[in-house]
From Swiss-Prot:
Principal subcellular localisation of the protein: membrane
Annotated source species: Homo sapiens (Human)
Annotated compartments: Cell membrane
Segments on the Extracellular face: 1-25, 80-100, 159-195, 260-272
One cellular-component annotation, GO: plasma membrane
Pfam family, one: 7tm_4
Protein name per its UniProtKB record: Olfactory receptor 1E1
Membrane topology of the entry: Multi-pass membrane protein
Length: 314
């Protein structure tokens, strides 16, 4: 329980973004617009997949869960950022901070696992097209989604419980716009070696292994594509996984840039900008990537609009 924790502080202070006072209103409007775009874009994908029977396939089951994850991922941090910018109150209660950290880890990790499931789906579709329906059965797809939720829930809960056992005294200023786990560890008064070891070990399992699995899937995909005799077949195969590859590059590019390429003397501003990329920009762009480069999504949108027009004309 929170009351049993040995903390001597009741809340933290989020420094937020390094924005000049005269730019506050403009930045507030910008982030609000980006957040609303993220909500509407991902909700549109979820609704289209739900309403259009043509999209009731394994790929779009994973995509609907990915859109839900993106929607929630942004909702974990951006509303609090907007509230702090509007009220000029940077405080966040201790329990709320740990809750935010938990859901941030949960939905961030969930996206990583769902991208692996989608890569496997594309691998089966291209390398074993005749056996696709048999391999990607509804039972397997639901099992992959359920396993993703279970593993990410366990991982997020593990880090949250380890953080809750730490003692925080005096210094409660977090140089970030959300309760980042690494920033919280720097404020801890007690020994954090267990936390750091778990981050190192679990980080490899949650981020590195999924990334390697995706690379392995695409290596097999490229190998199979190069065996296709016609250039038309090659283009069709690449277009099948183009959207997913774009999302993978966007997600892992920002995460790797933040956690693997950051040096000891990297600035807080740089870390904040990189974090903003994968918490705000990436979830906002994903719906555009899947809608603009995906004929199935465009067709589904046209059919749903046509059905609504027909309904209202009756």
């Amino acid at each position: 329980m929170m009351g049993q924790n040995q903390t001597s502080i009741s809340d933290f202070l989020l420094l937020g973004l390094p924005i000049q006072p005269e730019q506050q209103n403009l930045c507030y409007a910008l982030f609000l617009a980006m957040y609303l775009t993220t909500l509407l874009g991902n909700l549109l994908i979820i609704v289209l997949i739900r309403l259009d029977s043509h999209l009731h396939t394994p790929m779009y089951l994973f995509l609907s869960n990915l859109s839900f994850s993106d929607l929630c991922f942004s909702s974990v941090t951006i509303p609090k950022l907007l509230q702090n910018m509007q009220n000029q109150d940077p405080s966040i209660p201790y329990a709320d901070c740990l809750t935010q950290m938990y859901f941030f880890l949960l939905f961030g990790d969930l996206e990583s696992f769902l991208l692996v499931a989608m890569a496997y789906d594309r691998y089966v579709a291209i390398c074993f097209p005749l056996h696709y329906t048999a391999i990607m059965s509804p039972m397997l797809c639901l099992a992959l989604v359920a396993l993703s939720w279970v593993l990410t829930t366990f991982h997020a809960m593990l880090h949250t419980l380890l953080m809750a056992r730490l003692c925080f005294c005096a210094d409660n200023v977090i140089p970030h716009f959300f309760c980042d786990m690494s920033a919280l560890l720097k404020l801890a008064f007690s020994d954090t070696r267990v936390n750091e070891w778990v981050i190192f070990i679990m980080g490899g399992l949650i981020l590195v292994i999924p990334f390697l699995l995706i690379l392995g899937s695409y290596a097999r995909i490229v190998s199979s594509i190069l065996k296709v005799p016609s250039s038309k077949g090659i283009c069709k195969a690449f277009s099948t996984c183009g959207s997913h590859l774009s999302v993978v590059s966007l997600f892992y590019g920002t995460v790797i840039g933040l956690y693997l390429c950051s040096s000891a003397n990297s600035s807080t501003l740089k870390d904040t900008v990189m974090a903003m990329m994968y918490t705000v920009v990436t979830p906002m762009l994903n719906p555009f990537i899947y809608s603009l480069r995906n004929r199935d999504m465009k067709g589904a949108l046209s059919r749903v609009i046509h059905q609504k027009k027909t309904f209202f004309s009756l």
